[in-house]
Amino acid sequence: MPRRGLILHTRTHWLLLGLALLCSLVLFMYLLECAPQTDGNASLPGVVGENYGKEYYQALLQEQEEHYQTRATSLKRQIAQLKQELQEMSEKMRSLQERRNVGANGIGYQSNKEQAPSDLLEFLHSQIDKAEVSIGAKLPSEYGVIPFESFTLMKVFQLEMGLTRHPEEKPVRKDKRDELVEVIEAGLEVINNPDEDDEQEDEEGPLGEKLIFNENDFVEGYYRTERDKGTQYELFFKKADLTEYRHVTLFRPFGPLMKVKSEMIDITRSIINIIVPLAERTEAFVQFMQNFRDVCIHQDKKIHLTVVYFGKEGLSKVKSILESVTSESNFHNYTLVSLNEEFNRGRGLNVGARAWDKGEVLMFFCDVDIYFSAEFLNSCRLNAEPGKKVFYPVVFSLYNPAIVYANQEVPPPVEQQLVHKKDSGFWRDFGFGMTCQYRSDFLTIGGFDMEVKGWGGEDVHLYRKYLHGDLIVIRTPVPGLFHLWHEKRCADELTPEQYRMCIQSKAMNEASHSHLGMLVFREEIETHLHKQAYRTNSEAVG
């Protein structure tokens, strides 16, 4: 063990000494670059025998001065980066020293696992070598290709869109926008201040000055990410009056995995208050309670149900259903709130949240058409934390079973329809109605906006409140949450925007693209089948 400490100390000493020498070398280069020329015989550039005016030489000197200033700024940035790397490496060596001390006590963290590379720069370069940047990789099929996405100064052209993104759009997310701006700036830095090993020659302008590229010279770029290696960028620049393009390849390598935290989460005592706003739709409520009985009463057993019912019609049927469940399963953990007013989902959830009078509780805002599993309830508990996180799962929405299972006499039972396939449903990434959040967070943020009437909109308002706040929003598809198909009616009383959203949702809910296409071309298909049958019969008779 003392021998390991001596080796580590020696490596630390030489590493720090090498970085210090590197800093000194960069500083010396900076002084050489920025020092004025002392050669008295040096003449200003120009063609011998030509008479240039004073303005020409002043412009030329100004260009040279700007070049030196740009180079000086670049060198200063490199010096700052080296200082930062020196500090990071010092901290890393200190961390290794601490780990060595911990290992000496018998509780080493990495044990016999693969050790993190001692030279971080070497590791990052190895990531480039592993990625498919310079040499192609043998792939098993066309599905193994990682496609690029292309971009310009203002637009991104993407393949993976979901249902809310567009084939062409401005980068809305700040991280993506900042990433592309940084990449273009880095590409310009490479072109305007090339290294000696770069395969490019300095081009001169009409007055002999060095060409300086800017962001307006950026033509297009491509990027793709290999999840375990990093992101590759291919950038192309071109001056309007030149025929040649400048091509820059950049790579942002991913570093080694780093532990952020490790904790134990106890969910055995976490009660979920499932809040369901409801108006009429008693048949759907019967189906909902069947799922509730199987999952919540028989399996989970740590659930409270709050039903907020609007209107009088159907209220007695809902009471009867709840009383039947109580008598059959000895379940009493439910609350029925009756509101004699027009249905408003946001109002119902607000009332349901405030109806709970036993302090803090985790709430799941649910609809009567939702089918969930016991595993989802645990995901709900794991991904919501009071004062820190709210959970917005993406629901898998099922298509119209009459279309999906049109080749069967009767659609299969609901339990057999719960599959994640392209023709059976879609991820409802534009929906924010199903959410798990703690009561204190919901009340602190102000709940739902009561100004929103009718269908849709109130969920997005609440979602945006959390996005504008300090809580972490966990947004992810989950396998145990399904939206069952039901016929959707768009009321005439809706605003034009709400009506458009309702019709859009109705169209997306009906069937997949291929199934809708089969419906559109049904007559053409039937005509073809009739012709085939007629031809077959004619050949048989002949």
UniProtKB/Swiss-Prot annotation:
Pfam families found in the cross-reference section: CHGN
Annotated coiled-coil segments of the chain: 59-105
Tissue spec. comment: Ubiquitous.
Lumenal side: 33-542
Cellular component annotations (GO), alphabetically ordered: Golgi cisterna membrane; Golgi membrane; membrane
EC category: transferase
Binding positions (a divalent metal cation): D369, H486
Cell compartment(s), UniProt: Golgi apparatus, Golgi stack membrane
Glycosylation site list: N41, N333
Membrane spanning stretches: 12-32
Similarity remark: Belongs to the chondroitin N-acetylgalactosaminyltransferase family.
Name of the protein in its database record: Chondroitin sulfate N-acetylgalactosaminyltransferase 2
